[in-house]
Amino acid sequence: MEKFINNAPFALVLIFLVMGFVLLIKGADFFVEGSSSVAKRLHVPSIIIGLTIVAMGTSLPETAVSVSASLTGNNELAVSNVVGSNIFNLMVVIGVCAMIATVNVAEETIKRDIPISLVCAGFLLLLGIVGLGDKEGMILGHFDGIIFLCAYAVYIFHLIKTALKASKEDGKVEIEGGSDEDIKLVSVPMSILFIVGGAIAIAIGGDMTVDAASRIAGDLGMSQTLIGLIIVSIGTSLPELVTSIVAARKNEVGMALGNAIGSNVFNIFMVLGIASAISPITIVAENIIDLCVLIVFTVCVWIFAGTKRKIGRMEGSCMVALYASYVVYIMIR
């Protein structure tokens, strides 16, 4: 695939990039639907399905891109894809939602999820600079990846324990992915087909996206960091943006911020954890700057959310404007 894309006309490379996005997004949808159906047939509680399979499914495109980039030595793309996606989810997806309809913020999002998200970004910054598992800094090595994966396992165990307790006390708890009725049951053969077909589509889409993005960066004289921060991260996050806009128009954005924060935690701990555990990832100076920007933006959203327990049109406009300013900065730096 890489050899073919490198020798293809530029217009065809752009088509391959779009095709890669489509395969990633649709593959993730099929994989989640098949996995959720199997889990439901095995009588796995919907709370656990929502917090694991469904929540992770939204980040499968980022996972595929970063793992593929890590394996092919495109380290800048592996990190910038995750950081760029986190910034886009936080500032644009939530910002646009807030511009359409007020986003109410749950107390646990302010007291638990946003602080954990800040710890994640700070932890990545620390490991990126120090490189605890390697002799030299600026590298996420195998040991660092294992640390990330273990940290996420503890985090998800805490979420499941908390959700199950809330479910017993209140009889119902909101989760990403919705309630029992939102999980479609399909036949076992069809579920297996969805899982296998979705996984294949994700793998092919990840390789296609990375190869096309690398070729575009080379032809336009742009760094892989820039391509990852803007084009790839936005492409893999478009489903969340479209879904959030539709929900905002129906005034159903109560879980929007919590879901975005949860996705950001997954992207850092699991996506980069898997990628670096498979193949060490080099951190470049630009990644450090972008991580600092992510931390600053997260603090801004924390302040917006904490003042009135909601994010309104004014705050949403500020968030989108901050993101636009950031894009201008990374294009001229």
Ranges and model annotations:
Residues 1-333:
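Hydrophobic alpha-helical segments, chiefly the membrane-spanning helices
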